[in-house]
Amino acid sequence: MLQSFIKKVWVPMKPYYTQVYQEIWVGVGLMSLIVYKIRSADKRSKALKGCSPAHAHGHH
């Protein structure tokens, strides 16, 4: 009973869900990539600033 109901609902909805999820995953992947790039760039700039002891001492 429940399985036939699931099949009736899921089969027409399945392509829609998979397409939406693909777009979500692409978005998530792009966002994480952007965040990673920003963080690595931020670390690099902090490392450059940290070379001078005055900055490293006063910035915590």
From Swiss-Prot:
GO terms for cellular component: mitochondrial membrane; proton-transporting ATP synthase complex. It holds the Pfam family Mit_proteolip. The chain crosses the membrane at residues 15-36. Keywords: Membrane, Mitochondrion, Transmembrane, Transmembrane helix. It is found in: Mitochondrion membrane. It is a single-pass membrane protein. It comes from the Eukaryota. Mitochondrial membrane ATP synthase (F(1)F(0) ATP synthase or Complex V) produces ATP from ADP in the presence of a proton gradient across the membrane which is generated by electron transport complexes of the respiratory chain. F-type ATPases consist of two structural domains, F(1) - containing the extramembraneous catalytic core and F(0) - containing the membrane proton channel, linked together by a central stalk and a peripheral stalk. During catalysis, ATP synthesis in the catalytic domain of F(1) is coupled via a rotary mechanism of the central stalk subunits to proton translocation. Component of an ATP synthase complex composed of ATP5PB, ATP5MC1, ATP5F1E, ATP5PD, ATP5ME, ATP5PF, ATP5MF, MT-ATP6, MT-ATP8, ATP5F1A, ATP5F1B, ATP5F1D, ATP5F1C, ATP5PO, ATP5MG, ATP5MK and ATP5MPL. PANTHER family: ATP SYNTHASE SUBUNIT ATP5MJ, MITOCHONDRIAL, MITOCHONDRIAL PROTEOLIPID. Belongs to the small mitochondrial proteolipid family. This is ATP synthase subunit ATP5MPL, mitochondrial.
